[in-house]
UniProtKB/Swiss-Prot annotation:
Role description: Removes maltotriose and maltotetraose chains that are attached by 1,6-alpha-linkage to the limit dextrin main chain, generating a debranched limit dextrin.
InterPro entries in the cross-refs: GlgX_C (IPR040784), GlgX_Isoamylase_N_E_set (IPR044505), Glyco_hydro_13_cat_dom (IPR006047), Glyco_hydro_13_N (IPR004193), Glyco_hydro_b (IPR013780), Glycogen_debranch_bac (IPR022844), Glycogen_debranch_GlgX (IPR011837), Glycoside_hydrolase_SF (IPR017853)
Hydrolase in keyword set: yes
Chemical reaction(s) catalysed: Hydrolysis of (1->6)-alpha-D-glucosidic linkages to branches with degrees of polymerization of three or four glucose residues in limit dextrin
EC number per UniProt: 3.2.1.196
SMART domains tied to this protein: Aamy (SM00642)
Gene: glgX
One of the GO biological process terms: glycogen catabolic process
Name of the protein this chain belongs to: Glycogen debranching enzyme
Superkingdom in the source lineage: Bacteria
Length: 657
């Protein structure tokens, strides 16, 4: 192979120009950077990157081509007390690699020393970065650009959603291809989903601890290479990018957006006892938040925390997000532990990455959803993200469960959550869509498990049931587990209907966990991050089709009610909402605070939702007018006309006049 010439300092990563490959790498503290390329036999050839502009090291390989496998060895001081941990014995993944080949094994070759750098060479087992030529025919594809007011999000796992679907060809189940299969798209359209939110598909690794237990990181919240698509959901690693883009294109043609759950808060290098794979060896002090003793600030609970207030790291993350929008036509992002994005180290709305996203013409137009917390001091930031971010609303999740399952919530608090949590989000010109309402998510009980289990049952995770939250706000209706008498089963069914009705008819952006609409259970496991097995895969042959139709009818109903699709906050007397007691009278101050958990909500003056969260049948007098119960609470051709509703325990109904 030829020697390197200087090349250019941009863009970051490996760029093929038709004749050769330009390589660039950021490192502020390195003293020397070697590019390591590998031939088909695995032989390694090393070249010093010959040029440096500021903190960008770069070089051009004239005969480099797509498919070339490479990595870096970075030389510099070993001063762990200052956060400097350079060790050229470790082959490092390009942080901007567009493809990575190989998995991270539980192997001591990846580990480094405490006082001295570990001299063992990791190249024999290290994953390889791969040069990619990015050509794809989008055939005029464009984003469905669903208005926030009409958005219904469906949170799903690529494999778990499709792996057991009997109508999808067996050879593509559990893959990107399956997402774009006509059967899956038809199902999402029938359900009324506008936006498919996928759990992480950036190339990720399984933690060594899980590997020793014979488990894997199923969810994917352990990123290895943030520009690289994970190949495990492809028919072949080389086809992953096109197969995923084919799926995005097919979903777009059906009017469905694709949102990615992304992890910009930590990396798969974990704590100082974890593997050295990329960022730690490239520039540990720049990429991570470092304590005064040289260890990591662990505000993520995963061992390390990315320092997104560092200008170069913020630009790296910004470029990554832009890349996914421009190259894969992604319609939005959900940011895991998003408070890290605003740390300076205290949380600030003006943090570099948040400012870059807000001012970016590419990113500011896509959907942006923050998980507004991390585990560090000051990490809980619900309601504090700037526009245009929406946020997961755990207030809503807990309040809705408490109202229906624990009977421990005032009507005032319930109404506040039902009306887009205006006390939390009505600021800085934000709209009602800013709250992403959820009752369940990948993290926690499924909806069915919320009504079947009082306690978590996470023994299969290998931590003696210590992992996962104990604060579930669930109710098993008298017996722990999925079994029970017919009475128990009926009360659980009513509670599920009530929770779904509340979720899908509240103001704000609803998010539905895949499988909740057909009764999926994880048998009480509320932290199934490492369960790549039938516990998490949706069982389509056992799906509760009645519950699926109920959910689809609710979503269809939601889209018909102006008060739920408009981007305006509800105000007293504006005709959007009226709050009534069981006698059709305005709720009194006493009832708001201490009234029985029973109320009527009149939306857009024509739709009436009646809620009875008591244990008894309650006679509810409807307001004046001719009210008809409507689907999914009555047949389309045989609506029930009533003036008084005898609300069963845990009961809900919707009427139209």
């Amino acid at each position: 192979m030829t020697q390197l010439t200087a090349g250019k300092p941009a863009p970051l990563g490996a760029s093929f120009d038709g004749k050769g490959v330009n390589f660039t790498l950021f490192s502020a503290h390195a003293e020397r950077v070697e590019l390591c390329v590998f031939d088909r036999e695995g032989n390694e050839y090393r070249y010093d990157l010959p040029a440096r502009e500021g903190d960008i090291w770069h070089g051009y390989l004239e005969d480099g081509k797509p498919g070339l496998r490479y990595g870096f060895r970075v030389h510099g001081p070993w001063q762990p007390e200052y956060g400097l941990r350079f060790n050229p014995a470790k082959l490092l993944i390009d942080p901007c690699a567009l493809r990575v080949d190989g998995d991270v094994k539980d192997d001591p070759l990846f580990l480094d020393g405490e006082q001295q750098p570990d001299p063992r060479d990791s190249a024999a087992i290290a994953p390889r970065s791969v040069v990619v030529s990015d050509v794809y025919d989008w055939e005029g594809d464009s984003s469905p650009d669903i208005p926030w007011g009409n958005t219904v999000i469906y949170e799903a796992h690529v494999k778990g959603l499709t792996y057991l679907h009997p109508a999808i060809p067996k050879e593509i189940r559990g893959t990107y291809k399956a997402l774009g299969h006509p059967v899956m798209i038809a199902y999402l359209k029938h359900l009324g989903i506008t936006s498919l939110e996928l759990l992480p598909i950036w190339h990720f690794a399984s933690e060594p601890r899980l590997q020793r237990l014979g488990l894997t990181n199923y969810w994917g919240y352990n990123p290895l290479a943030m520009f690289a698509l994970d190949p495990r959901y492809a028919s072949h690693p080389e086809r992953a990018r096109d197969e995923f883009r084919d799926a995005v294109k097919a979903l777009h043609q059906a009017g469905i957006e694709v949102i990615l759950d992304v992890v910009l808060n930590h990396s798969a290098e974990l704590d100082l006892d974890g593997p050295t794979l990329s960022l730690r060896g490239i520039d540990n002090r720049s990429y991570y938040w470092i304590r005064e003793d040289g260890d990591y600030h662990n505000w993520t609970g995963c061992g390390n925390t990315l320092n997104l207030s560092h200008p170069a790291v913020a630009e790296y993350a910004h470029a990554c997000l832009k890349y996914w929008v421009e190259t894969f036509h992604i319609d939005g992002f959900r940011f895991d532990l998003a408070s890290v994005m605003g740390r300076t180290p205290a949380f600030s709305q003006q943090a570099p990455l948040l400012e870059a996203i807000k001012n970016c013409p590419v990113l500011s137009r896509v959907k942006l959803i923050a998980e507004p917390w991390d585990i560090g001091e000051g990490g809980y930031q619900v309601g504090n993200f700037p526009p245009p971010f929406a946020e997961w609303n755990d207030h809503y999740r807990d309040a809705t469960r408490r109202f229906w399952l624990e009977k421990s919530l005032s009507l005032g608090e319930f109404a506040g959550r039902f009306s887009a949590s205006s006390d939390v989000f009505k600021r800085q010109g934000r709209k009602p869509f800013s709250t992403v309402n959820l009752v369940t998510a990948h993290d926690g009980f499924t909806l069915r498990d919320c009504v079947c289990f009082n306690q978590k049952h996470n023994e299969a995770n290998g931590e003696e049931n210590r992992d996962g939250t104990n604060n579930n706000h669930s109710f098993n209706h008298g017996i722990e587990g999925l079994g029970g008498s017919q009475d128990v089963i009926e009360r659980r069914r009513a509670s599920v209907h009530a929770l779904l009705t509340t979720l899908l008819l509240s103001q704000g952006t609803p998010m539905l966990l895949a499988g909740d609409e057909h009764g999926h259970s994880q048998h009480g496991n509320n932290n199934a991050y490492c369960q790549d097995n039938p516990l998490t895969w949706l069982d389509w042959e056992q799906a509760n089709s009645g519950l699926t139709h109920f959910t689809a009818a609710l979503i269809q109903l939601r889209q018909r009610i102006p008060a739920l699709t408009a981007d305006t906050w509800w105000e007293e007397g504006d005709g959007n909402v009226r709050w009534l007691n069981k006698d059709a009278q305005p709720l009194s101050a006493q009832e708001w605070q201490n009234g029985m958990p029973c109320l009527q909500i009149l939306l857009s003056d024509n739709w009436l939702i009646t809620f009875n969260a008591t244990q008894d049948v309650v006679e509810i007098v409807l307001p004046d007018g001719e009210w008809r119960a409507i689907p999914p609470f009555a047949g389309e051709d045989n609506p029930v006309v009533v003036a008084v509703w005898h609300g069963p325990a845990h009961g809900v109904c919707v009427f139209q006049r």
